[in-house]
C-alpha cells in the first residue's frame, strides 16, 4: 500500500513536470525553440 502511494506521487510529479515544460515551450517557443518541443511534435512558429 505504501509503495503504491509513492508511485502515485512520482507519477503526479512527472505529469506536472511535463505540463510545465509544455507551457514553457509554447510561451518561449518563438524565442528559443527547445529540443523537447521538437520531440513532442509541437510546431514552433
From Swiss-Prot:
Membrane-spanning residues: none
Domain of life: Bacteria
Record keywords, A-Z: Cell outer membrane, Lipoprotein, Membrane, Palmitate, Plasmid, Signal
Coiled coil (UniProt feature): none
Gene Ontology cellular-component terms listed: cell outer membrane
Biological processes annotated in GO: cytolysis
Signal peptide: 1-17
Lipidation (S-diacylglycerol cysteine): 18
Record's subcellular location: Cell outer membrane
Role according to the record: Lysis proteins are required for both colicin release and partial cell lysis.
Protein name: Lysis protein for colicin E1
Organism: Escherichia coli
Amino acid at each position: 500500500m505504501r509503495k503504491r502511494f509513492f508511485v502515485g506521487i512520482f507519477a503526479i510529479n512527472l505529469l506536472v513536470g511535463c505540463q510545465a515544460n509544455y507551457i514553457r515551450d509554447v510561451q518561449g517557443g518563438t524565442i528559443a525553440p527547445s529540443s523537447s518541443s521538437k520531440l513532442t511534435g509541437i510546431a514552433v512558429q
